[in-house]
Amino acid sequence: NQTNLTSTFYTGSIGHDVSTGVEFTRETQTNYGVNPVTLPAVNIYHPDSSIHPGGLTRNGANANGQTDTFAIYAFDTLQITRDFELNGGIRLDNYHTEYDSATACGGSGRGAITCPAGVAKGSPVTTVDTAKSGNLVNWKAGALYHLTENGNIYINYAVSQQPPGGNNFALAQSGSGNSANRTDFKPQKANTSEIGTKWQVLDK
């Protein structure tokens, strides 16, 4: 859900084009593991489209992730003169991510899980059950100068952050491996700067 309010007004000789709002999102993702299927070899130069793997069956492995985010934001474009503009904005996010996963035990190869005592091979065993919460501050600022009616030059700078689990709703246990989704890791931060020019060369 997103509610946005826009307003245009003046403070003295400076024009403002303001956009403010609040946003609430809930994103969920569920993945299921399936039993492997062995298919016959295929000639890549003469593929056989009649080969079918048959129905896939779940093996008990699964992963469930959910992220709730509440945000407020405000952006303003200031018309300083006819040709010169300043712009800036800030967004504050509060997030909470929950994640759990289970793997079929007794398999082989990388990432295989040993079955606990008394648990049959192939049974799902919980491997991760964790959560992460926090606050993020993202902002940007810039300036633009109109050289002509059809062209301008601009400069922008922005700071954005992505918390663990922010791109795939998956978390990793604290202290385990080098995944960026570990719950003891800080959000990843990106600083972006840009200088450029834009020109309208086609008739509108």
Regions found by a protein language model. Give the residues of each.
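Structural signature of Gram-negative outer-membrane beta-barrels, strongest in the C-terminal barrel
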Residues: 15-19, 23-27, 65-204
